[in-house]
Amino acid sequence: MLKSSGFGKTVFALFLSACCVTPAPVSAAGAAAAAKPRVRTARHRYVPREKAVDPTLGDITNFDDPIVRAAAVEALGKYNGSVVAVEPTTGRILAVVNQKMAYSAGAIPCSTIKPTIALAALEENVITRDTMLKVGRRKYMNLTEAMAHSNNVFFEQLGQRMGFETVSKYGRLLGLGELAGYNLADEQPGAFPMAPPHKGGVARMSSFGEGIQVTPFQLASLAAAFANGGTLYYLQYPAAGQPGQDAPIFEPRIKRELNIAPLLPELREGMLAAVLYGTGKRSFDSGGDELPAGKTGTCSDDQSHVGWFLSYADEAHPKLALAVLIRGRSSLIKGPLAAGVAGRIYRRLREQNYFASLSPTTDLRSGR
């Protein structure tokens, strides 16, 4: 089994050449078409950045880490989205941007369901890291490549081999369909089906989450568990302190131990590959020592297009786990767009030496 410690440093040189793809040339006709002003119609009125929104309206920020929150707000900009950042080793919420969306019923997970399916398949010995599955007429992939490129056919096969009951068992074990937070009054639990979805069955459920609803809190909690070695914490803010206390009280609360540590190196390899040369490469920070691991999700539901990114950084001493959700009517809304938001957060925090800090930066006594 591949060791996860120091892995990012080793694979960086191997994958670096794949990170940079030369854009296809644009024809003169294409350039002329692009230069024409866009006609604003009802169909396109929700294109990102054409209609500015403030995702922070109504947010209560008393106990948010000010540095993390500022980085997340700046990175999200005017996109109709949400960011949840947590401390992986405690479950402490560091920032929630667009709390209305974060506390909502959630969205289809799209391909962010794939890490859960991968862990289930590894634990059930359906595959190993090196198992090659046929994903095209003459094309085969192993788990790392399938994670990097978010290959639906690969994960459809895993779901079909395991069946609905096994997929459901691991989905619920990892916290889907239940509250991720502790004492978060407005949080919704998302939804996890009691039977295979009518449309596509367990195959589509395993490739992009058909029939499932997840929240940013749930994916941030899951990313934190991947980062810390398999402890699923309740996400929570510090409790309000009593008069005379120096600071509010924070006590980590463990929901369950997942016992997935032996499988995490294989999972991390795929999530690193996604960042280095796959669908999550917009999250890569070339100037940082912390190599983020992540997984994108791109699909649509009845309401809008959906772009997800779950991620964590600094494996040796994990300090940050992220879930980014962006929604909108434009087909530009995709997982790589959410990965770009995470990348800007990582870069901003690195510029402020956040990852060099040994403790959270929030002054809990003042709440600022």
Regions found by a protein language model. Name each.
Residues 52-55, 59-60, 71, 79-96, ...:
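Beta-lactam-recognizing serine transpeptidase/beta-lactamase-like catalytic domain environment
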Residues 103-115:
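A short, polar/charged loop-to-alpha-helix boundary motif
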Residues 227, 275, 343-350, 354:
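Short amphipathic alpha-helical signal-transduction/dimerization elements
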